[in-house]
Amino acid sequence: MPQIVVAALYKFVSLPDYQELQPGLLALCNAQGIKGTLLLAEEGINGTVAGSRAAIDALLTYLRQDSRMVDIDHKESFADEMPFYRMKVRLKKEIVTLGVPGISPNKKVGTYVKPEDWNTLISDPDVVVIDTRNNYEYEIGTFKGAIDPATTTFRQFPEFVRKNLDPAKNKKVAMFCTGGIRCEKASSYMLEQGFKEVYHLQGGILKYLETIPEEESLWEGECFVFDQRVAVKHGLQVGDYDQCFACRHPISAADMASSKYVKGISCPRCYDRMSAEKRARIAERQRQIEIARQRGEEHIGDNARQYSLIHKLSKTKKILPKT
């Protein structure tokens, strides 16, 4: 069976007509059997999708026919199975949510650093290296010596900067993220705050892991990705982590050996924080998934939106979801 191509792509570019782009883009992806999520906003496009080699090539060709996206950045990795359940093209205020008005990499952005030059930069003792990802991403892997902002969402990054960094003291700042989009927007924010030398890893961690040999790498651990692969290693090989359905955090083999781990229901991180009602609701959903799997049906996918609605109604009416 041919491998599935997983393409992470984004571009900050002025798209005042972004709403008009949605129908055609969704139709193309559906026709090609592509699954994943694409975000459209006035500031650009962002997303990760998966499909056959021909399908992904067709999507990239379609996007690059628009002169504004002719040089859209994309990174590829591979999976043995489709890592997404359905295709979504969403309209958003921001393609990556910082929550600070007026911040635009289309107007001001930091210095891009190629993976080949990254080790030299972050080995400089005068450079402050910041991981702009969330805490659960940092926990399973990061660059040696990188600062963890301990954020749970990208919206919290400006507060971290305000409390912990000073343009007068931190002369050189280097940032990185999964694919490059968060650190690119963060660099725009940092420049607006008065920082002068702001660098960010071009192509993100994924490009670094693809490009730099493991024996030369300063990366430690695995890189969390937002699909069913959960994490990737050097060479973009699928990592060793799984994911807890309940809290969505990556879980290790040690976590799965815990008495608090129940497949599809809980893990050591969320077990003690989960109400009995929620645990019962998740257990019922897992039961339905297993039934569908035994019947050879897709419980999640085309019917996911319907399930989501039922799930929301069940929370309102205090009943268990039914499918």
From Swiss-Prot:
InterPro entries from the UniProt entry: Rhodanese-like_dom, Rhodanese-like_dom_sf, TrhO, TRHO_N
Key words of the record: Oxidoreductase, tRNA processing
Keyword Oxidoreductase listed: yes
EC number per UniProt: 1.14.-.-
Active site: 177 (cysteine persulfide intermediate)
A GO MF term: oxidoreductase activity, acting on paired donors, with incorporation or reduction of molecular oxygen
KW tRNA processing (keyword) present: yes
GO biological process: tRNA modification
Limits of the Rhodanese domain: 123-217
Catalytic activity: uridine(34) in tRNA + AH2 + O2 = 5-hydroxyuridine(34) in tRNA + A + H2O
PANTHER family: RHODANESE-LIKE DOMAIN-CONTAINING PROTEIN 7-RELATED, THIOSULFATE SULFURTRANSFERASE/RHODANESE-LIKE DOMAIN-CONTAINING PROTEIN 2
Function: Catalyzes oxygen-dependent 5-hydroxyuridine (ho5U) modification at position 34 in tRNAs.
Similarity annotation: Belongs to the TrhO family.
NCBIfam families linked to this entry: PRK00142.1-4
Protein name listed in UniProt: tRNA uridine(34) hydroxylase
Species, as recorded: Methylobacillus flagellatus (strain ATCC 51484 / DSM 6875 / VKM B-1610 / KT)
